[in-house]
Design a protein with these regions (language model features):
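N-terminal active-site segment of His-dependent metallophosphoesterases
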Residues: 1-50, 54
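Acidic, His/Gly-enriched loop-helix segments that form or flank divalent-metal centers
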Residues: 92-215, 219-226
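A general structural motif
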Residues: 26-29, 58-60, 142-143, 178-179
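Binuclear metal-dependent phosphoesterase catalytic core
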Residues: 209-249
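Active-site environment of divalent metal-dependent phosphoester hydrolases
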Residues: 9-13, 39-42, 68-73, 155, ...
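Positively charged, low-complexity/disordered segments
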Residues: 251-262
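Active-site neighborhood of phospho(di)ester-bond hydrolases with catalytic His/Asp-centered motifs
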Residues: 5-6, 31-35, 62-67, 148, ...
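Active-site neighborhood of divalent metal-dependent phosphoester bond hydrolases
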Residues: 40-132
Length: 262
């Protein structure tokens, strides 16, 4: 079966614990990550090492691109301009840093050079913006999914660059002109719970649902800031509509509350 996992953000121990739980119950599990492997969390280096070793375009572990990976790709162009012109660190021309902490991680890992950065830049640049997947559910129905980091725009004629930006950054959850079910991350359900304007089935710190929309970003990296909420790393099974999490299993509850057929 196929499982979509939310934003990792350097939470290596949570990621490994969740993968172990899923794979102990389903040895043939196929895993799709929604991007944002980096920044904020305690073990970005370990997450990156694991990702480069295991994630491929069509293998057991797959992924789409997150906005944090995209921001690094944009920063890399500035870094290379600086490197080609300055050649080394200079007080007059300080090295450009990433908006978040990726460049500091690279520096700490001894990778802050064109050669050192290349494997990570290659990995990020080959992550697709979205994936379409069709599965047969446990009840025998065929369901089309769109796996994306943030949102998918179904209006015809949308320019590619606009679609890519939407895939990475937009927050229009549930407004889809398609029968596909969009599974995404990007906005932690903790944050969505604070937005009174959003008519959204919010379960703070857990996977949340709207019409044709599943948000798997439970905000794992923020769990210390929100001790009153579960705030865990979660996974959604495309075939059974069940959830998996490292700390608790709530699949039966969610299966009874949400289905693409109502």
């Amino acid at each position: 079966m196929h499982y979509v996992i939310g934003d990792i953000h350097g939470c290596y121990q949570d990621m490994i614990a969740l993968l172990n739980k899923i794979e102990s119950q389903d040895q043939d599990a196929q895993i799709i990550f929604v991007g944002d492997f980096i920044d904020r969390g305690p073990d970005v280096d370990k997450v990156l090492d694991w990702s480069l070793e295991n994630i491929t375009l069509d293998g057991k572990y797959r992924a789409v691109r997150g906005n944090h990976e995209q921001m690094v790709l944009e920063w890399y162009k500035e870094f290379m301009d600086w490197y080609d012109n300055a050649g080394n660190y200079s007080a007059r021309e300080p090295m450009p840093e990433t908006y978040y902490d990726f460049s500091r991680w690279m520096d700490a890992m001894g990778k802050l050079s064109p050669a050192g950065l290349k494997p990570y830049i290659d990995f990020f640049s080959h992550l697709p913006y979205n994936r379409k997947m069709t599965v047969e559910t446990a009840s025998g129905k065929t369901v089309d999914y769109r796996i994306v980091h943030a949102f998918y725009e179904y209006d015809e004629g949308v320019p590619k660059l606009e679609q890519y930006y939407t895939n990475l950054y937009a927050r229009k959850y549930g407004n889809y002109k398609s029968e596909e079910i969009v599974v995404h991350g990007h906005t932690p359900t903790i944050a969505l719970a604070a937005e009174d304007s959003l008519t959204y089935n919010i379960r703070p710190g857990l996977i949340s649902y709207h019409k044709s929309d599943v948000n798997v970003d439970c905000g794992c990296v923020y769990k210390e800031a929100y001790p009153e909420y579960p705030v865990m790393l979660g996974a959604f099974c495309l075939e059974t509509f069940e959830e998996r999490s490292e700390e608790r299993r709530v699949g039966k509850e969610c299966r009874s509350r949400w289905s693409p057929y109502h």
